[in-house]
Amino acid sequence: FGASASKTAILRSDEASGNSDYAKPGMYGSSLNSSFYTIMQPFGLLYSTASQASYVIENVDKVTFPDEALKNAYKGEAYFWRAFVHYYLLISYRQVAPIRHAPESAADYVRVVEAPGAVWDFIIDDLENAKNLLPHKGYWKGVNVGRITAAAAAALKGKCYLYRSGIEPLYGESTKTYYDEAAAEFNEIIKGSYGGYSLVEYSWNFDVAHENNDESIFEMQFLGDVENASFNPGTATSGLAFDTRGLMLPGTGVGYEAVVHDWLYDAFVSSLDNDGKTDNRMFSTMIFNDLKAEIKLRKGQRLTGPGGYHFEDYYPKGDFSSVGNTRTYPYKAAVLKGLDLSMPMRNNDPTSLNGVGAGTKEYIYNQPRAHGVNWRYIRYADVLMMYAEAVVLGGKVGSLSAAQAFNKVRERSNMSTKGAITMEDIKSERILEFALEGHRFFDLLRWGDLASRFKSLEKSDPNFKKLISDTDYEGFTENKHEWLPIPIAELESNEYAKQNPGY
């Protein structure tokens, strides 16, 4: 997740474009094939995690622990991670040959691809086991803060019920929905059954200083490193850091940059709070020129980026035409979420975005590929929003109404509340609350909106997915691009594996 998986999730969506290898899956072109490394690496590493988790599940009881609760916590973590990687394989690649037991020989890696319903059941069973074994909030102390808790298992279980209810009626053979089950899992978290979670200052969810805060339910832990910045997914040191290549600011060099599509920028500009000011969440989501008249600043408010500088410090012309890559010029904003602003700059000249010397790779930060911002995969805000969605779609009302849960998220950002909500309200709010966090593509997938959304933007936005070139983006193809291709190595080594349609 520090490399291909997170960037692929973001850049496959309609939110942003990049010009790195990580962006290729989101270009939907002929270069996206089953041998491309950003397809192969997540697939292999996710299965590797499933194997390791299975070994722990089957062997941890053989180890003597002074504390039974600690043994249960470790076993619960293993169940959780095995569930999570299978869940992510299922929503990304669709065809999954689950690892139900620890492989003992090469033959054990040749497994039958099971029906999606069976895989969902396996994932949910693992999460139930995890939930019953894992500790509640507050158990982990010191260096262990941030490890998996029962609330994370409950939240992911609810998320699986919600995703299954959307995906399978559209792409599978079952029309059964699980909105009651989803709402019930989320409601237990809202009630405080696993400890108290709350909404914090929005910006705290995307920085280093406030990691593992009271809003964090499932947070992947990363550690910035200014010395060891080389990134090889699967190696010991690489797993410690978040690789920002493919999400960096315009001017950091082709292969590193990303831009935000105008529709997302415009959505935030149109979102005004109760005081008539620009939605505060915009300032933690993207880098943009906040001195434009259309941006309604609060007294003393300014957007700050790397080194504490402002947009005009990096881009004196007021837009991206200040830097060398002409393909960035038409866009209004760039990605901010995921960037570690605590990392030191190599020099104090913010206009020297592309290094301190000809031919160097010493961009904005000391090293751009070893950032330390944790990836908050499930926040309490997401639990509230998913609960509201499950209830709107027919799930049983728990301790809050759908509108009450929805309004809690809105109120945190000083936005107006609603007396009743619809799915359109939820879709709009998820854009503003969770932009560029890796959920948008899968939201569109489970709502059945992917193809229509991409076709609409292909017609209305001449710069949509054009950061690499005018021709790399070949258009979203329905009944193909919902899923990533199965890697060639899997097709060649597993007789039961078949390629996804269209590849």
What are the roles of these predicted feature ranges?
Residues F1-L11, G26, N33, M40, ...:
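Acidic, glycine-rich segments characteristic of secretory precursors and extracytoplasmic regions
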Residues F1-S20, E128-K131, R147-G324, F454-L457:
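An aromatic- and glycine-enriched ligand-binding surface/loop that stacks and positions planar moieties
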Residues A16, L46-T49, F122, N144, ...:
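Long, intrinsically disordered, low-complexity segments
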Residues N19-Y93, Y109-D121, L127-G142, D340-M345, ...:
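Conserved, well-structured interaction surfaces
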Residues K24, D273-R379:
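Flexible, polar/acidic helix-loop-strand segments at domain edges
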Residues L90-A97, Y163-G172, L393-K396:
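Short coil/turn linking the two alpha-helices of tandem helical-hairpin repeats
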